[in-house]
Structure formats: structure tokens, C-alpha cells
UniProtKB/Swiss-Prot annotation:
Adapter protein able to interact with different proteins and involved in different biological processes. Gene3D superfamilies: HORMA domain. This is Mitotic spindle assembly checkpoint protein MAD2B. The keyword DNA-binding applies. Belongs to the MAD2 family. One of its GO terms (molecular function) is DNA binding. GO terms for cellular component: nucleus; zeta DNA polymerase complex. The lineage of its organism: Eukaryota, Amoebozoa, Evosea, Eumycetozoa, Dictyostelia. The keyword Nucleus applies. Keywords: Cell cycle, Cell division, DNA-binding, Mitosis, Nucleus. Transmembrane segments: none annotated. It comes from Dictyostelium discoideum. It is found in: Nucleus. PANTHER family: MITOTIC SPINDLE ASSEMBLY CHECKPOINT PROTEIN MAD2, MITOTIC SPINDLE ASSEMBLY CHECKPOINT PROTEIN MAD2B.
């Protein structure tokens, strides 16, 4: 079992990371993200209620399985326009089995005080043992409580290091030029109104079913994409340009775990949250958007001719560690 507060911290971290990854890989135009402060640093967060709610619901649905310690790793996979995986951002979870044998030995040693004084000191020894036993129990309870509490400062420092590392893989999210462009895009977008071309709720889908954002109309969105294609600086800001990228979230369960309670008919240990299967009906409201879980195979999620890049940002509370790394296709 994992600590509940630790699971909440990890869930919030994954949400933030997913937004940052979608931004740096240009899955959606950068102007559709705004800056928010997280872990004392500015991070890009999507302004789409649909996408934000989708990611949030996806992570929330995993919390019971975090608590049961049945999840081995989570990966956000970037797909090209042919639905071929080209890059994965992987979060691998490993738990440390804490034992209390040493503490029990110390308790036993402390409780066996001066048993040779069987006559004259009998009553004194009884009082001494009771006092020592109670004292040791209180100390052990304090130690156990402290061990069960995640080190929040250490966690936040690890989160911050990871976020900065992936943001710096772009041509600098923190550069003055990009900061100006993002601020300018954010201020100009705020004056835009949703009009025709949406689904009645501000949701916009193009012909391939990819859901776009709720604060611009279809004509404005196409103009943004056209500008990104024609202007080199916008292509640089979104490295993948106009490639119609998509993403999926894969959840890998531990080898000893099957199904993890999401669907009793699943036989694979890899599950997939597919954002393209979110409801797109005109009467759908934001509150009805929930993750769609489907089964997938190892082959479907594999990247051919890939290489691994360790990010060397081990995130830990002292008992549970999250290793982070990326897997990239050699030929995209």
C-alpha cells in the first residue's frame, strides 16, 4: 500500500508533466497554453477545459490502483498522423519493502532488563520494564509515523527538477522571446469568442476526430496552423510543426497483477486511455468527459528502432521511487 498523500502528490505531478509534454512536443499549438506557477516555476498549462478535465479524470481514475501498488509504470505516448508511436515519456514506479525486524529486536532487548534481580529488585524491575516498554513503544510509533509521511520538500525539489529538464529540451520555454510570444498569444486569445464550427459547447473536432480547444473557432484555429506552417519562428516554437500529432496514456500493471479492476474482460497488462474516444456529441458537457479504457498489446505500444534517454530525475519519498526516462524513435 502506498501513502495516500504521496499518491495525491504524484497525481498532481503527472498532470503537470502531461501538460508540459504536450506543449514541448507541439501536439497542440503553443498559443493554446498559458503560463501557470507550479513548484515555484512557470509551466505551460492547457487553456482547454476539455483537455484539462480529460487529463485530470485519467489520473484520478488511477488513484485507487496507486494506493494498492498495482501500477508498474505510466507512459504518455506521442503518435504521428499514421497513429504510429514515435516517442514515450515513461514514469516507472518501484516500491521499497520496509521491514521492522531491527526495531523489533531493539524492543526485545530493551524489554529484557536485569532479569537476574529476582528477589530484592523484583518490583523495581517490573516498574522499570513497564516504563521502558511504554517509552520504546511511543518512540517507535513516532518513528513509524515519520516514516509514513512523504518528504514534501524532497518531492517538490524532484518535481521541479524534472519539469525544468523537459521544458529545457525545447528551444527554451524560458527564453525571453518565447515568453513574449506566449504572453502575446494568451492576451490576444482571451478576446476571441467561440462561434460556429464547434459542437455547441465550444468543442472543435477536425476530420480525423482530434479534439481541439474551446476558446477559438475553427477558422481561427486553421489560421493559427497556417501561420505556424509558414513562419519559421512558429515552427521552431512547435518543433513538430503541422504533423497532426496525437497522444495516448498507457498504464502498465505489475506482472503479478491482472486487470487491476478496470475491466474484468481484459487479458493484457497494458491498458490505454484513448483521448480520441472521448464523447463528441453536441449534448455532452464537460462533467461527462471521462477516460475511455481499452485493451492494447505490447506490440501496439512498442516503438520500433528506438533508443532510451534516462532523465536521471529519480522522484522519491524515501519508500517509493519514480524513475523517469524517454523512449524515442530513430526515424519519425
Amino acid at each position: 500500500m502506498l501513502d495516500e498523500h504521496f499518491c495525491d502528490c504524484i497525481g498532481e505531478f503527472l498532470e503537470t508533466s502531461f501538460h508540459c509534454i504536450l506543449y514541448i512536443r507541439g501536439v497542440y499549438p503553443s498559443c493554446l497554453f498559458s503560463k501557470s506557477i507550479k513548484y515555484d516555476i512557470p509551466v505551460p498549462i492547457s487553456r482547454s477545459d476539455l483537455l484539462t478535465r480529460y487529463i485530470s479524470n485519467s489520473i484520478d481514475s488511477l488513484k485507487p490502483h496507486f494506493l494498492k501498488d498495482t501500477i508498474e509504470k505510466i507512459s504518455l505516448t506521442i503518435l504521428n498522423k499514421y497513429d504510429k508511436p514515435i516517442e514515450k515519456f515513461i514514469f516507472e514506479i518501484s516500491s521499497l519493502n520496509n521491514t521492522t525486524n531491527n526495531k523489533n529486536k531493539n524492543n526485545n532487548n530493551n524489554n529484557n532488563n536485569s532479569d537476574d534481580d529476582e528477589t530484592f529488585n523484583y518490583y523495581i524491575n517490573i516498574q522499570k520494564q513497564n516504563y521502558t516498554s511504554n517509552n520504546n513503544n511511543n518512540n517507535n510509533n513516532n518513528i513509524n509515523n515519520n516514516n509514513n509521511k512523504p518528504n514534501l520538500l524532497q518531492l517538490e525539489a524532484s518535481f521541479k527538477a524534472y519539469i525544468i529538464k523537459i521544458l529545457m529540451t525545447t528551444d527554451s520555454f524560458y527564453s525571453e522571446q518565447n515568453f513574449y510570444k506566449t504572453q502575446q498569444s494568451s492576451s490576444s486569445s482571451s478576446s476571441l469568442k467561440t462561434s460556429g464550427g464547434g459542437d455547441g459547447n465550444g468543442f472543435i473536432s477536425n476530420s480525423d476526430g482530434v479534439i481541439h480547444f474551446n476558446e477559438i473557432d475553427n477558422e481561427t484555429y486553421q489560421q493559427i496552423k497556417s501561420n505556424q506552417k509558414n513562419k519559421k519562428e512558429d515552427n521552431d516554437d512547435n518543433n513538430n510543426g503541422d504533423k497532426d500529432l496525437k497522444f495516448t496514456i498507457h498504464v502498465h500493471t505489475k506482472p503479478t497483477t491482472s486487470n487491476i479492476g478496470l475491466n474484468t474482460n481484459l487479458s493484457n497488462v497494458i491498458l490505454n486511455i484513448n483521448p480520441l474516444e472521448s464523447p463528441r456529441r453536441t449534448n455532452t458537457t464537460i462533467n461527462q468527459i471521462t477516460p475511455v479504457w481499452i485493451s492494447t498489446t505490447e506490440k501496439d505500444s512498442e516503438i520500433e528502432n528506438s533508443y532510451i534517454i534516462p532523465l536521471n530525475s529519480n522522484i522519491t519519498d524515501g519508500k517509493t521511487t519514480i524513475r523517469t526516462f524517454t523512449e524515442q524513435s530513430i526515424t519519425k
